[in-house]
């Protein structure tokens, strides 16, 4: 691993960023491995590298880079969040809990602490009642689609269909559309509690988006007009 001058490093960094934008994390990792990141001080760059390693399931390398970033960041709560997630991916619950304690010291009032606590508790396989209480506390602070659905799913798994149904209805009312609303409708469907309009919306996702005869004719007309225009220009 040779030492790069500033220009070589800049070029490689541009290549990495382009590959990340294309979500080609495997290709980006090929470049990342050729650089000694211990010499890099830019926290944002280090975080990108940490994410690349995590995307390639190289969690030990990801953790090492995130630790470098954490020690160079003035306030590192977001980096601690990722360190906790990476530690959990590595099944290192003890280390995740140590990072979580650091997170609480830095950001004791940040509502994200509930999500981190939930992720750790889930990995530890604590009883569902405890997991539910954590997400209920979070819901009192923040009402978000993803974690509301997660809570509804826990209610369902715990056999509390009434609370599951109430929360699913609340999600549909507040958010109306989106991935997690469809997941909430799926839970309602399993319980046989979809309304007529909800069933129509739920079933629609399984129907291919086919082009009608009229739309196809219109597309062909537009294409013919474009070809004629190009011929006239020539």
Describe the residue ranges of each PLM region.
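Ankyrin-repeat and related helical/solenoid repeat scaffolds used for protein-protein interactions
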Residues: 123-171
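Register position in tetratricopeptide repeats
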Residues: 21, 55, 89, 123-124, ...
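TPR-adjacent "capping" and linker segments in tetratricopeptide-repeat scaffold/adaptor proteins
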Residues: 1-10, 34-41, 136-140
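Alpha-helical adaptor scaffolds
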Residues: 47-54, 67-68, 75-143
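Short solvent-exposed coil/turn linkers within tandem alpha-helical repeat scaffolds
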Residues: 37-40, 73, 141, 174-181
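Intrinsically disordered, low-complexity, charge-biased linker/tail regions
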Residues: 1-30, 75-85, 98-120, 177-234
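TPR-repeat structural position
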Residues: 25, 59, 93, 127-128, ...
């Amino acid at each position: 691993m040779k030492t790069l001058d500033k220009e070589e490093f800049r070029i490689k960094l541009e290549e990495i960023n382009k590959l990340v934008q294309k979500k080609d994390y495997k290709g980006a990792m090929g470049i990342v491995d050729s650089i000694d990141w211990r010499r890099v001080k830019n926290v944002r760059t280090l975080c990108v590298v940490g994410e690349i390693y995590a995307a390639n399931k190289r969690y030990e390398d990801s953790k090492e880079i995130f630790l470098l970033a954490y020690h160079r960041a003035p306030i590192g709560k977001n980096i601690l969040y990722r360190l906790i997630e990476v530690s959990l991916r590595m099944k290192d619950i003890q280390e995740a809990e140590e990072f979580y304690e650091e997170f609480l010291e830095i950001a004791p009032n940040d509502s994200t602490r509930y999500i981190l606590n939930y992720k750790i508790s889930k990995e530890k396989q604590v009883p569902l009642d405890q997991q539910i209480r954590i997400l209920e506390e979070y819901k009192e602070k923040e009402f978000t689609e993803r974690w509301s659905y997660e809570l509804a799913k826990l209610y369902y798994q715990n056999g509390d269909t009434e609370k599951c149904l109430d929360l699913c209805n609340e999600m549909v009312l507040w958010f109306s559309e989106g991935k997690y609303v469809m997941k909430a409708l799926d839970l309602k469907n399993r319980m046989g509690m979809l309304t007529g309009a909800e069933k129509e919306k739920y079933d629609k996702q399984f129907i291919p988006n086919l082009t009608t005869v009229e739309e196809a004719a219109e597309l062909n007309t537009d294409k013919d007009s474009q070809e004629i225009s190009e011929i006239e220009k020539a």
